[in-house]
């Protein structure tokens, strides 16, 4: 989420969110502004999620799933160490296949 969007974001209702982010992303730095963790927390709070599952897909990739939100909404966050602004795929070592993850997420809603 860009700094402009962050400063002007005023959602009218809860919205499911999927965030895939490389720690070493220099195009959209994880530290922001705003910090990606802050953005994810904002959406998790807005969606009134009550459960957080934290899973290491592989040692370098942590997946956080904020579940049981309003209207069944969820917030998913895949944080990939040693990864920049690239598309995670089966050919790399991230443990995340972006296309499949996106389909899995959005097919729920």
Residue ranges and their predicted role:
Residues 1-109:
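Flexible, surface-exposed loop/gating regions in the mature catalytic domains
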